Amino acid sequence: MPKRDDIKTILVVGSGPIIIGQAAEFDYAGTQACLALKEEGYRVILVNSNPATIMTDKEIADKVYIEPLTHDFIARIIRKEQPDALLPTLGGQTGLNMAIQLHDSGVLEANNVKLLGTELESIQQAEDREMFRTLMNDLNVPVPESDIVNTVEQAFEFKEQVGYPLIVRPAFTMGGTGGGICHNDAELKEVVSNGLHYSPATQCLIEKSIAGYKEIEYEVMRDKNDNAIVVCNMENIDPVGIHTGDSIVVAPSQTLSDVEYQMLRDVSLKVIRALGIEGGCNVQLALDPHSLNYYIIEVNPRVSRSSALASKATGYPIAKLAAKIAVGLTLDEMLNPITGTSYAAFEPTLDYVISKIPRFPFDKFEKGERELGTQMKATGEVMAIGRTYEESLLKAIRSLEYGVHHLGLSNGESYELDYIKERIGHQDDERLFFIGEAIRRGTSLEELHNMTKIDYFFLNKFQNIIDIEHELKNHQGDLEYLKYAKDYGFSDKVIAHRWDKEEKDIYQLRMSQNIKPVYKMVDTCAAEFESTTPYYYGTYEYENESIVTDKEKILVLGSGPIRIGQGVEFDYATVHAVWAIQNAGYEAIIVNNNPETVSTDFSISDKLYFEPLTEEDVMNIINLEQPKGVVVQFGGQTAINLADKLAQHGVKILGTSLEDLNRAEDRKEFEALLREIAVPQPQGKTATSPKEALENAREIGYPVVVRPSYVLGGRAMEIVDNDQELENYMTQAVKASPEHPVLVDRYLTGKEIEVDAISDGETVVIPGIMEHIERAGVHSGDSIAVYPPQTLTQDEINTLEDYTIKLAKGLNIKGLINIQFVIAHDGVYVLEVNPRSSRTVPFLSKITDIQMAQLAMRAIMGETLAEIGFKQGIQPYSEGVYVKAPVFSFNKLKNVDITLGPEMKSTGEVMGKDLTLEKALYKGLTGSGFEVKDHGTVLMTVSDKDKDEIVKIAHRLNEIGYKILATRGTAQKLKDHNIPVEVVGKIGGEDDLLTRIQNGEVQIVINTMTKGKEIERDGFQIRRTTVENGVPCLTSLDTASALTNVIESMTFTMRNV
């Protein structure tokens, strides 16, 4: 069947900012799809609000709009561009919901826009819980006993019929937003009211819990001729009850009999045929472990997290082929790009095992509720490939970067067995490691199976890992056992620990005895056809399939799993670096382990090694490939942390030298450099003990900022005001980084400025300066950044330029550097310097059209910036105003305080661009999910130090016509200035403010932190209540003031004559 010729222009909707439940997998899918459509000759228009993606690069589509993903903005683009068709199935839940809204409002019909891919009716049948249930009943496919409710009362009626436990699933949401498992009336009331709030259709499905069943997924493809195949089937190690995004997953499934496998396969294909899906689709099923009974849980009629995993697990490019199916091509006429000889209608087969483990943010949010359920909490994931299940699991564990390298906890031996069992009884992110500890203590697999419902197959594999540990301990120095342990994925570090040796001893022993891994190809067909892909994994076998060429090579380290503080921005830089390396004529090799990203698409680099980012795993690749050098500055802290270790093996680190990287990180050396080049910094000291920290703080004067050295994303960083707070911090934070001391700095309140620059050692190019809306003290990743700066004097800009050039030259930077400054009372001070690619590189690259990561890579390879055509200093400004606004995922993380401070908390970002600051801010806030209303009620409760400042904001909001509520102290201050205000009661009292928020009477909350136990708890409760009820809460007065500017620009002033 030829492709459709009745359409020329296609609008593709992206998925927007990275949030929990919707991460980098959609950048990968969207990029693939746009390129596939262009390949077929269509004109592609893309709209997405996330600047940190490869997808929003100009080369990916014919026209790129970085605009908020709301009905109104997309409608404007449709009216302006007049596309013939809209492809919504590659933009996650956001894309689907937009398609439904644009259809319902009549915009698509009025502009003659057709929907491509899966029909709208099918999307609604899969997403609307009522319609889906009806269809399943018609097909005789069992679904769990359930009911659709639109009110809390209806939920209680259903509970009377079936009893607890119950699972609540809101309609039209992703990542299980608002859903959960309920065991009692209180939980049912909370979860259902939450779920109705988050569901655009105010609809929840309530079903009898089948927790304990096996959860199986099939990733399927279908075209318009009804050809349908299974691309990959996957098994969740965790039984039903934990969201698949939070489950440990293995592919292919390990515990299904052939009868079970074929039965579930047939059902999956039957369902997507009945739904009429064209493209990729994910089917989730629950199988009773003791019979052939099964239920269908849900169907995602779109490309998803699971399809990104399935693509990387099999090498089969689902998103690319789904896009081509959407324009009418069929599976039997498209070649499989991996083999280049077989067709896309062949089902992939695997001769290896894949393990995926989610990456959770609890190392950042130690107080967050860790218990896992049907609402997703992971920010990202890692994948590993091995020849045995044990090997793939252990490789995945050491890819997580939790400081855990094995099936156990770093201080596991210190726990009591009772505590270990108690932790296993709760489903949380550490359960796997506690199971390892329990097996070490001799707990029977039967007991573990009864507690967890994890299949005996997996428990036996865990047991095998522990058995090998014992064998190692009993056979110290025995090469046979060393080889055996390597076959099952043990790292040198773990073997060294069992043999009471150093990791390097084991490495040297392996080298001397030639015990090295070989690299196998991922080819979709278990080596049945000749394959051309350069996609490899390491394993301890005999034949090496990775053929080393005689071309000069450069190895780029990726940034691993997505987590808070290290997002898709680093993947963006990695991909651009690879393109620059290829353009310069070198062979580009990537090492990375994140299945969601563009960098792990085999078509990006000349060779892709899907391996853990550890010293051992990277050295094994270097020993084989012998690259000219390794690039670490694009892979975030993950890659930087490996530089030292690789250099000790004699590996050449390209770009800024290791000495200079360390000079930027080492406090004393950095201070010496600043004195030498005369760049001021806030007064600061280094402390290695609580006593020393107190002496330092008293000498400098409070408030001080305290943080461990060598961390990313402001981990364990705090602003403290007195001795007591400092003592509390020191007893908890010193463990944050034992080999490295704690830094104590004077805390300067002032404007925070961020600068990214590129240097070749001679010329320093500054693409732009960004000014933060929030004053210093809020982490740069959580601040709203504005380009070009709006309130700086020319003198200040000249000073910033001068200091940036001095720092880049003083540190001998080759490549990228990111600097944060503060402008306080009497001048410009440097806060910190990062000699690497930063979070703002994609944002600035998009604005200025200077491909910063590529330019940096060219400088690293020896080109001079002057030859390329750049002059030193700040580059000419782009027209317009650009805003980078942070996006948070607090609604998915219970018990996490949303107050902004020096620890980073946002998971993603959006860009707003327009001709004025207010319009750009409006777009940034709207794109980040903040509904800006020109009237309503604002609730204010601020700390004493902020009371003077809140008066101005209250006055302006009152002028616009906002109604003001305030707690007693704040209200008194406003009354003193003749601002009309209504006093609300304290928590727990009459007419308390939480009830007001819960009843939907408040549109905005402004709440700043007051220290002190009781008040802090109240403040925390207020902030969490706003999150649970979807009310915007501002914890910084600078953000509140900026929002007030936006509202003022939307309204007319009303004053009597």
Curated annotation (Swiss-Prot):
Mg(2+) 2 binds at residues 298, 300. Residues 1-401 are annotated as: Carboxyphosphate synthetic domain. Its EC number is 6.3.4.16, 6.3.5.5. One of its GO terms (biological process) is 'de novo' UMP biosynthetic process. Mg(2+) 4 binds at residues 832, 834. It is an enzyme of class 6 (ligase). Mg(2+) 3 binds at residues 820, 832. Its cofactor is Mg(2+); Mn(2+). Keywords: Amino-acid biosynthesis, Arginine biosynthesis, ATP-binding, Ligase, Magnesium, Manganese, Metal-binding, Nucleotide-binding, Pyrimidine biosynthesis, Repeat. Residues 133-327, 671-861 form the ATP-grasp domain. Residues 930-1057 form the MGS-like domain. One of its GO terms (cellular component) is cytoplasm. Residues 930-1057 are annotated as: Allosteric domain. Pathway: Amino-acid biosynthesis; L-arginine biosynthesis; carbamoyl phosphate from bicarbonate: step 1/1; Pyrimidine metabolism; UMP biosynthesis via de novo pathway; (S)-dihydroorotate from bicarbonate: step 1/3. Signal peptide: none annotated. Mn(2+) 4 binds at residues 832, 834. Composed of two chains; the small (or glutamine) chain promotes the hydrolysis of glutamine to ammonia, which is used by the large (or ammonia) chain to synthesize carbamoyl phosphate. Tetramer of heterodimers (alpha,beta)4. Large subunit of the glutamine-dependent carbamoyl phosphate synthetase (CPSase). CPSase catalyzes the formation of carbamoyl phosphate from the ammonia moiety of glutamine, carbonate, and phosphate donated by ATP, constituting the first step of 2 biosynthetic pathways, one leading to arginine and/or urea and the other to pyrimidine nucleotides. Belongs to the CarB family. The large subunit is composed of 2 ATP-grasp domains that are involved in binding the 2 ATP molecules needed for carbamoyl phosphate synthesis. The N-terminal ATP-grasp domain (referred to as the carboxyphosphate synthetic component) catalyzes the ATP-dependent phosphorylation of hydrogencarbonate to carboxyphosphate and the subsequent nucleophilic attack by ammonia to form a carbamate intermediate. This is Carbamoyl phosphate synthase large chain. It comes from Staphylococcus epidermidis (strain ATCC 12228 / FDA PCI 1200). The gene is carB.
